[in-house]
UniProtKB/Swiss-Prot annotation:
InterPro entries: UPF0473. This is UPF0473 protein str1961. Pfam families: DUF1292. Belongs to the UPF0473 family. Disulfide bonds: none annotated. HAMAP family: UPF0473 (MF_01448).
Length: 101
């Protein structure tokens, strides 16, 4: 299984708006090209400025996304919890990313 990923974002920041209209800034940790296997890309996000907790962990959110035709912005969608194949691929790429850093 081969998936391209990019982690040279120099801490690109995006904002997400929740159901209550609250805007939260996130840093892009990693993008994954899953188009060949799943027909979409993925992005892993961490809250902007977040630090590890007492256990050395940090909250990471994963979304699938589709870029606009001009390569800018796009739609983020939650990844279905029951999509084991997608989650397995994301976990594999993330673990490789951690091992490289």
């Amino acid at each position: 299984m081969s998936h391209n990923h990019d982690h040279n974002h120099d801490h690109e920041v995006i904002s997400l708006v929740d159901e209550q209209g609250n805007e939260t800034l996130f840093e892009i940790l990693l993008t994954i090209d899953g188009r060949e296997e799943f027909g979409k890309n993925y992005v892993l996000l961490v809250p902007a400025g977040a630090e590890e907790d007492a256990d050395g962990e940090i909250e990471i959110q994963a979304y699938s996304f589709t870029e606009n035709e001009d390569g800018t912005e796009g739609d983020l969608q939650p990844i279905p919890e029951d999509s084991d194949a997608e989650w397995d691929m994301i976990e594999e790429v993330f673990n490789s990313f951690i091992d490289e850093n």
